[in-house]
Amino acid sequence: MSVPGAGPAPRSRLLLGLAAGAVAFAAADTYVVVLALVDMMQGIGLSPEQLQRAAPIVSGFLLGYVAMLPLIGRIADLRGRVPVLTAALIVFAFGSILTAAAYDMTTMVGGRFLQGVGGGGLVPATLALVADLYPAHRRAIPLGIVSAVQEIGSVLGPLLGAVVLAVADWRAIFLLNLAVGLVLAAAIAAAASREGVAGRGASAASHETASPRVVEQRGAPATSGPPPVVEQRGAPATSGPP
């Protein structure tokens, strides 16, 4: 375990790195479908001329993502950071397989919504994990990194989609999500078990960061981008998917 006032142990850094990677991957899924929308519509029997009907495929994800932000902080305080992170990844993976198997718009949008619910749960739980692993005066950099990887994931989403579409069909995007989500969930659980990080808010400071809305820290600029995640003492502003 970490010595009070010092940085986290190497295994704790690994745990935080895995959580940040999960945040980036989920953020990428916001717009990973942009280049696949026409193929996805054809997969459920809609023509390219009905492209306007594809909007819920993107907005369904965003709705689930934003809906979870005010709720997960408190749940992470009560149930623990790692259980919430792994549960969020499992929900994300389930939404991915539901989307991959979809043959109508309702099922597809439902799957995307569940992906958003899982992805939205990762952000506050990861911020709370930072508060557990780092003393207050050393949180600016790790919190900034979490915000940065979220933004990077959102930007790289369409590129990831293009790479997958170059070698497979649109359903492969969501099968990849399924595999990565389950692998990250298992890796986070294993890393937490080896380090002994379980997590029900270790301090008042961690409760602050876990709470739904995260705010700009003194001296740390707020990040811009997708739906803002929040303001609260002790953490820099972060954001949801664009």
Mark where each language-model region is.
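Cytosolic juxtamembrane N-terminal segment immediately preceding the first transmembrane helix
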Residues: M1-A28, V33
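Extracellular/periplasmic helix-loop-helix junction of adjacent transmembrane segments
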Residues: A36-A67
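Helix-breaking motifs and short loop linkers at transmembrane-helix boundaries and internal kinks
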Residues: G43-G45, G80, A101-T107, P135, ...
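Central cavity-lining transmembrane alpha-helices of secondary-active solute carriers
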Residues: S59-G73, V123-L127
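Conserved MFS/SLC helix-loop-helix module at the cytosolic interface between two early adjacent transmembrane helices
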Residues: A67-M105
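Cytoplasmic helix-loop-helix junction between adjacent transmembrane helices
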Residues: L114-A148
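Hydrophobic transmembrane-helix bundles of small-molecule transporters
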Residues: A166-P242
